[in-house]
Amino acid sequence: MTQTNGFDALHAHAQRLRGAAIPALLAAEPERPTQYARQVGPLYFNFARQKYDRAALDALFAIARERDLSGAFQRLFRGEQVNVTEQRAALHTALRGDLTDAPVASEAYATAEEVRQRMGSLIQQLEATDVTDIVSVGIGGSDLGPRLVADALRAPSGARFRVHFVSNVDGAAMQRTLATLDPARTAGILISKTFGTQETLLNGSILHAWLGGSERLYAVSANPERAAKAFDIAPGRVLPMWDWVGGRYSLWSAVGFPIALAIGFERFEQLLEGAAQFDAHVLNTPLEENVAVLHGLTAVWNRNLLGSATHAVMTYDQRLALLPAYLQQLVMESLGKRVKLDGSAVDSDTVSVWWGGAGTDVQHSFFQALHQGTSVVPADFIGTVHNDDPYAENHTALMANVLAQTEALANGQDSSDPHRSYPGGRPSTVILLDALTPQALGALISMYEHSVYVQSVMWGINAFDQFGVELGKQLASQLLPALKGESVDVADPVTRELLNKLRG
């Protein structure tokens, strides 16, 4: 990005604004609270407390045009091979809508629709049985997305199925889950793109044995033959996924099977509708009015121009408590790259460390560091305008904290006692959902997906591969025999010492 024609101008704006006080920016642009706000369907965004002004934003958008961001969106939606290292499309948008006239995208949408109807039929069959509980086994993209959505949208009571998620290879996770269940009234779903994932195979074997066979086992995989063979699952209970959908973008596919069981098939379709509506906004809205573009460019500004190494996400709705963990994978696995599309080294820092938690709990853990620490941490505050629980006073208090914390972080407060002084200058974006509905959550997740893509285009990196996860897995498979007592040549001296400790 530093090699673009507009970078010097952008850098000059950063030098000008780096030490600017956020109240001064608001005073200089009196209409800023509304001019820097956007409403897209059920989502409201306010960027007024970010440390840029109109001139800096214009410079950011100039680089986005130089990087052909609009063309990049067209290539994504039309199913071109934007995943250049694996020579694949990234057609997660086609799982939820048919928004272009590109044949490859339309065919992908039709294929996804057919599989979704198959999934609906399987749900109807399960509803006709005595099954009350579902154990969903997967990891990474096969777990984080479904777990987030199921937890966020499940009814407080009265759901037809209770869905339990197991991801970690640690046997304690499976033991604790199965201890509360009756195998005669439980079904299992094994989700793995390749069906070669160690965690899923080991946990799947435990579940298969506990259920007493494969009669109530289902699978979702891009390798359905291997899935069926590994656990003797009838082909009719195996749903496909595809190599043109990355795991962290796959909750909209049959990977969402446990979501549909947890919240109902109709509400699962509403989730997809909300995402598709936001997709349409991204595809059809000029860059300057495009919320995903503004969110992504804000992240680039904070990372590359203001030097922020981390980004916090605070969800002021307990039902969204798992969103920070989901976004960690979406953002950091997509953008944790050090080389550009052509294999040359990047010319600027890429992804920040994303982290966070649920408010107001986080105010009593790490907010001390946000307010008075030496690092400035940009943040997203996410809340809901309307709650649907009967405790209105609690929701009012929750939203008061959103308003108070974002104001305090931005404005600070002077004191004659330095221990009680707040420097301010901490930027944040506020995102408000009208209510936590399937449509709103679908739109919110879609926004973050597209924000990630914006950042990848600005940095010239591939958001859709993840080779960085492979080396550790390869080494683990080589070391496993050594932990079982076999003779293995281990070159690393520290690993040898640790092996000796583990083997006693």
From Swiss-Prot:
InterPro entries: G6P_Isomerase, G6P_Isomerase_C, Phosphoglucose_isomerase_CS, SIS_dom_sf, SIS_PGI_1, SIS_PGI_2. Pathway: Carbohydrate biosynthesis; gluconeogenesis; Carbohydrate degradation; glycolysis; D-glyceraldehyde 3-phosphate and glycerone phosphate from D-glucose: step 2/4. Signal peptide: none annotated. One of its GO terms (molecular function) is glucose-6-phosphate isomerase activity. Gene3D superfamilies: 1.10.1390.10, Glucose-6-phosphate isomerase like protein, domain 1. Induction: Inhibited by growth in complex medium but induced by culture in plant extract. The active site is at E333 (proton donor), H364, K473. It comes from the Bacteria. Its main location: cytoplasm. Belongs to the GPI family. Catalyzes the reversible isomerization of glucose-6-phosphate to fructose-6-phosphate. Required for pathogenicity. This is Glucose-6-phosphate isomerase. It comes from Xanthomonas citri. The lineage of its organism: Bacteria, Pseudomonadati, Pseudomonadota, Gammaproteobacteria, Lysobacterales.
